[in-house]
Regions:
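Mobile genetic element proteins and their domesticated derivatives, centered on retroelements
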Residues: 13, 33, 54, 66, ...
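Conserved pre-motif C helix in the palm subdomain of viral-like polymerases
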Residues: 4-9, 15-18, 43-78
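Short amphipathic alpha-helical segments embedded in low-complexity Lys/Glu-rich regions
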Residues: 15-19, 84, 124-128
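Polymerase palm active-site segment centered on the conserved acidic dipeptide of motif C
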Residues: 11, 95-128
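Short helix/loop capping segments that flank catalytic or ligand/cofactor-binding pockets
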Residues: 19-22, 31, 42, 59-61, ...
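Amphipathic alpha-helical blocks
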Residues: 1-37
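Active-site palm subdomain of RNA-directed nucleic acid polymerases
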Residues: 59-105, 109
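Short, well-ordered loop/turn elements at secondary-structure boundaries
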Residues: 3-6, 14, 27, 42, ...
Length: 128
């Protein structure tokens, strides 16, 4: 809880994080399920195309996607990437800054990095 060491806390949550992770076509058979619509006699076999919240592997998949994306930004924004890495837990960022201006700078930098992959964040600034 590094954010508690600063007067301004920054918490961010990737909106619909698990739905952002697309499963390769070759791997979708492992996410197969059967569906029967009302009034229909036949059972359909369908496959999920996105990572599901609640599967054991989902947090691992999301973590890999986020880490790979951060690696691609490490050369351009090394300080920001280091800050995000040490403050990120699965899809939640918990950090803090001494001033509101620095907290907003962290927020804007995070948006810039993650918008390239269409990750959307829910942000909160709190004064401790």
């Amino acid at each position: 809880m590094r954010m508690r060491f600063h007067p301004v806390a920054v918490t961010e949550d990737i909106k619909q994080a698990f739905l952002q992770v697309r499963i390769k076509k070759a791997e979708r058979d492992s996410l197969r399920f059967h569906w029967k619509s009302s009034g229909q006699l036949e059972v359909e076999t369908l496959r999920f195309t996105r990572a599901l919240f609640g599967l054991v592997c989902s947090t691992f998949l999301l973590g890999g996607v986020v880490e790979r994306h951060l690696e691609s930004w490490e050369g351009r924004e090394p300080g920001l990437v280091a800050e995000v890495r040490k403050s990120l837990y699965v899809h939640d960022l918990l950090s803090g800054k001494p001033t509101v201006a620095e907290a907003k700078e962290l927020k804007e930098g995070t948006i810039k990095v993650f918008m390239k992959r269409n990750f959307r964040f829910l942000f909160y600034l709190r004064f401790l």
